[in-house]
Regions:
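Bacterial carbohydrate/catabolite-sensing allosteric modules
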Residues: 15-257, 275
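Central regulatory/effector-binding core of bacterial HTH transcription factors
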Residues: 4-9, 29
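Short, charged beta->alpha transition segments
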Residues: 8-11, 47
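Generic N-terminal leader/processing signal
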Residues: 1-2, 133, 230, 266-269
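Conserved small/polar residues in nucleotide/adenosyl-binding loops
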Residues: 1-5, 257-263
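A short, hydrophobic C-terminal helix/tail in secreted or cell-surface proteins
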Residues: 260-272
Length: 275
């Protein structure tokens, strides 16, 4: 098995040497090797929909930074697909998706920086709102008031970025989930022990292992029944599967009193099929 991002720039033929190979989360539209992908787009969409269901109206995305929707149409990366799913959920709900709600952060350290930037934006929006309120109460006011509302929800492209974001927000006195709600992606075990515990999109790693094993077994059996040629020259088309996920609401989006005793399964996996 091969995690594509960790072998970027290395020809796959130099890795497999004619042996069965399964790529993990390669995200290619037309794969040349058997591939098992994470539920990147659907999972991100579900995460943002959860924030919306929790009452969020201005949702920030922490990941690779802003990309126009036209550029997301044919992305072939997990981060790009997650951004496509998240932005699609925002636009479908009539909520803003623009540069002002996108922040760069892919790990804990950059997540802290993103948390600081979001906190500063929130405090600025609060100050503007206070100024507008004071002005609207002044005698003789005729000018329309009302600035950009403060960010009240954050979707992070992975859990470790979310850990950093929560820390960065805390540095500015921003409370989660009281002031802003945060959700991550992947289902890192540490999210069960943080304060607050982290809401996340839990990917089915057991299913990933099973799909990958089934693909390798199929290739080996096909080769043994044939003339011993490499898998790719044997003419059997590459297959692609997407594992399932579970939306796990925890304290970072839902107050402890309202946490569901069991996570909600928001989708089923897509079984292996020819690309």
């Amino acid at each position: 098995m091969c995690i594509r991002d960790r072998n970027a720039g290395v020809p796959l033929s130099a890795i497999n040497h004619g042996r069965p190979l399964v790529l993990i989360d390669a995200c290619e539209e037309t794969p040349t090797f058997d591939t098992v992908n994470f539920p990147n787009e659907d999972g991100a969409r579900a995460a943002v929909q959860h924030l919306i269901e929790c009452g969020c109206h201005r949702i920030a995305i922490v990941g690779d930074g802003y990309s126009p929707r036209t550029e997301l149409a044919h992305v072939e990366s997990s981060s790009g697909l997650r951004l496509r799913g998240a932005s699609g959920a925002l636009l479908d709900a009539g909520l803003p998706y623009d540069e002002s709600t996108n922040f760069i952060g892919y790990g804990s350290d950059s997540g802290i920086e993103a948390g600081h930037a979001i906190a500063e934006a929130m405090l600025e929006a609060r100050a503007q709102s206070a100024d507008d309120t004071a002005e609207s109460r002044s005698p003789g006011t005729t000018r329309a008031t009302g600035g950009t509302p403060a960010i009240d929800g954050i979707f992070c492209i992975n859990d470790y970025a979310a850990f950093g974001v929560i820390r960065g927000l805390a540095d500015y006195g921003i409370r989660v989930p009281d002031d802003v709600k945060v959700i991550g992606f992947d289902g890192a075990t540490a999210g069960s022990y943080t304060t607050p515990t982290l809401s996340t999109v839990q990917v089915d790693l057991d299913q990933l292992a099973q799909f990958a094993l089934d693909m390798i077994t199929r290739r080996v059996e096909q080769r043994d029944q044939g003339d011993g040629r490499s898998d790719e020259s044997a003419g059997m088309p590459a297959t692609r599967a997407t594992i399932g996920y579970t939306l796990v609401p925890r304290e970072s989006t839902v107050f402890r009193l309202y946490i569901s005793p069991s996570p909600r399964d928001r989708t089923s996996a897509r079984m292996p099929s020819s690309a």
